[in-house]
C-alpha cells in the first residue's frame, strides 16, 4: 500500500457566513495537487455556532462544493459542517471522494459546556472510511476526550480529528492527540482552526500529524493561517503492530 499524503488546512473561519467561507477555501485549495486527503476544520462553513444549522447552507450545496474540490485536487476532501436534517441539526463530518461518493460521521460527544447538546443531535455510530488502501476513522473535536470511542480494534490506520478547540485548553489538545496515537498504535491527525469567533473564543490551531509511536511528524505554528503536509507510511504502522494492545 502506498503512503498516504495528507494536508491539513489550519485557517480562520468567517462567523456564520457559508458563502464567504467557501470562497476562502476556494483560494486555499487552488493549485493543491498530489495529495490523497485534504482536511478542513470543524464547522468550516460557520464557525462553532449553536444556531449555525438553522441558517446553514444545505447539505447538497456543501457536498456539491466538496465534490468539485475533490475532483479539482484528486483527493478526499474532509471537514465538518452544521447541517439541518430531517431528524434534527447535526455536526456532520463529511468526507467526499473525487468520484462523488460521500461518507459522513455525526459527532458523537457534544460539548455540553457550550450547550451543543441542546442544539444538535448526537450521532451514535462509528464510521470507517476506506480510501486508497487506508482505513480512516473520522472524529470531531470533543470526541478526543473519550478514548473508548476511538479504541482501535485493528479496524483503522488513521484517526482524523477536526476541531474548533479553544486556545486556553490547547495543552489538552496536544497531549490527547499524542495519547490517542500511542494507545491505539495508529496515525492521528488533528486539524484545528485559528482566529476568533463570534462568541469571543480564540483558537491557536496547533494542527498536527502524529505517528503510531507518538512522534509529531508535522505541526502548524500556533495562531498562523497555514497548511501542513505529511506522508503516512504503512511500514510504520506494521512496525507498531508487533505489539498490538487490544
Where are the language model's segments positioned?
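Conserved hydrophobic/aromatic positions in well-ordered beta-strands
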Residues: 7, 94-96, 103, 208, ...
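Short polar catalytic/cofactor-binding loops
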Residues: 10-15
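Extreme N-terminal starter segment of soluble prokaryotic enzymes
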Residues: 1-8
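Structural motif
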Residues: 36-37, 136, 158
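CN hydrolase (nitrilase-like) catalytic-core segments centered on the catalytic cysteine
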Residues: 60-78, 145-225
